[in-house]
A protein has these predicted regions:
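Alpha-helical scaffolds flanking conserved acidic
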Residues: 44-48, 77-83
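Short, thiol/selenol-centered motifs that function as redox-active sites or metal-ligating centers
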Residues: 49, 53-65
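Iron-sulfur (Fe-S) cluster-binding segments and ferredoxin-like electron-carrier domains
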Residues: 25-26, 64-79
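Amphipathic alpha-helical segments within well-ordered protein domains
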Residues: 32-33, 50, 67-71, 85
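Residues in soluble alpha-helical coiled-coils and helical-bundle/repeat scaffolds
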Residues: 36, 40, 57-58, 75
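Acidic, glycine/proline-rich low-complexity segments that act as flexible tails and inter-domain linkers
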Residues: 1-45, 97-115
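Short, conserved micro-motifs enriched in small and acidic residues
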Residues: 43, 57-60, 93
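C-terminal structural segments of small proteins and small subunits
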Residues: 81-106
Length: 115
């Protein structure tokens, strides 16, 4: 038996969120609609960006939802995969860049030890 770590997103859960915080839910929905509307960036490009960011934030609901939205807006499989690779490189690059913090601490510890 396979049980998912994340429950399925259902109409019942969406309704419960609306019931618990209706004003906040409405504000978030309005914000989201405005963010993903065509502007300087097309809605398609915004959804591709969202797919990449969702992989960095590791939100399975966001990955699924924004992938579907990107496809609806005309994104290709190749565009989505390239965006995911950009996100992967940025995440790996961040880890690599932050190694400077560890190296700095190593140098401080070595200097303190030798004094």
């Amino acid at each position: 038996m396979s049980e998912s770590l994340y429950p399925s997103s259902t109409r019942e859960l969406a309704q419960k969120r609306r019931e618990l915080t209706p004003d906040t839910e409405a504000a978030f929905q309005s914000f989201s609609q405005k963010v993903f509307a065509d502007g300087a960036l097309s809605a398609k490009m915004k959804q591709i960006i969202a797919v990449a960011v969702a992989h960095v934030t590791q939100c399975p609901y966001c990955i699924k939802g924004h992938t579907k939205a990107a496809l609806r807006h005309g994104a290709s499989e190749r565009e989505l995969m390239e965006a995911i690779w950009v996100a992967a490189e940025m995440r790996a690059g961040g880890a690599y860049a932050h190694s400077a913090l560890a190296l700095d601490e190593i140098q401080k510890a070595a200097a303190a030890k030798s004094s």
